[in-house]
Amino acid sequence: DASAMKSLREFVARAKKNGITVIFSHVNEQPYAVMEKDGFVEYVGENNFRSNIVEALEYAETLA
């Protein structure tokens, strides 16, 4: 839904402004498709979407 996407985009924008990378884990196919269509995946960076929490945590460690 549009309001959810707006809220997510604002959240990520605040995080980026503060030097924080937001990493998404285990996003299901349908919500991911909505995020992709909205341009949110490109905004966040496709590499910040991980298939599971272990991958997300391992990726986060590489950013530290």
Regions flagged by a language model, labelled:
Residues 1-64:
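Structured cytosolic domains appended to multi-pass membrane proteins
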